[in-house]
Each structure stands twice: as C-alpha cells, then as structure tokens.
Amino acid sequence: MKKIAGVQIPEQFRPWLKLLGKLVFLLFAIFILFGVVFGIGRVSGVAMNPNLKDGELVLFSRMWNSYTNDDVVLYEREGKSQFARILALPDQIVDMNDEGYLMVDGVIESSRAVVSTDDESAFLRVKNSFPYRVPTGKYFLLNDNYDCTDDSREYGAIDEKDLKGKAMSTLKVRNI
C-alpha cells in the first residue's frame, strides 16, 4: 500500500487514480479551449444561405481581436446569436448606387443588388438611408442571403462588444 495525502491506497486502485487524474486534466483543458478560446455556434435560419445553412455547427474563435471586411462573425443582438458577414469596418462609409449595389468607400462590395430597383418605393426608402458612416467601435454586417434584411441595413451597425468571435470552419456533424 502507498500513502497519498496521508491516506493509504491499495495497489489495485493506483492505476484508476492515475486515470482519474488524467481525465480531470483533460476535462479542464477542454473547458478552457471551448469556454475561453473557441466556441461552437449553430446557424439559425436562412440568413447566411448559401454559405451557412440552417442547423449547421460553426467553430469560431473567441480570441479574435481584429476583424476585416468579409469576415464571417457570430454576434449577439437582443439576446439572440446570429452569423453575418462584415461589410464595413469602423469609420468606413457605406453607400448604395442607383442599381442597388452596396459600396464601401466608393468600391462596390456586394456581388448583386441588395435591393431590387423594380419596387421603386422600397428602393428609395432604403437608398435614402445611405451614405452611412460606420461609427467608431461598430461594424456594418450583411447577411449572405440579401433577401433577409435582419442585418445592419435594418438595425444599423453592431457594437464591437457584441461580436462574439470569427467563424473558422463548419463542423460536418450528422443527426444532431
């Protein structure tokens, strides 16, 4: 028998105690990795179609401290986590041309018109909210599915403190 912390431990239990110690260490490491460094978010809805589909799991980094245009980020708004793409950074100017394309600092950034010019009243209503200077400390976010306007076109720029991390990869998991 061997004494551990003043308690005598029979020899047959020593391998189990070593295993238990390794498991505790492993669980602590996993907690640190996924509680502090990384996170996993679930895509909810069709706002990021076709790139991120409803129900997909996305690995994101919580440690990201500098974002760039076109980064996909997880953010929180009104208690709900959502994914969106950064269209413009703080202090950049977002504008819309007469064909409905969004521009950042004078350069067309959207791959297609974000607002149809067929419905003139809707187009003019959206067009009249531009040009828009992104305030310091905020980001202008845009969904990949332009028909879903639940993004900065509707509620303005998002505070940097509401960005939870940068998407790194989708996780291909079945039947969850």
Say what each PLM segment does.
Residues 20-37:
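Hydrophobic membrane-insertion alpha-helices, especially the h-region
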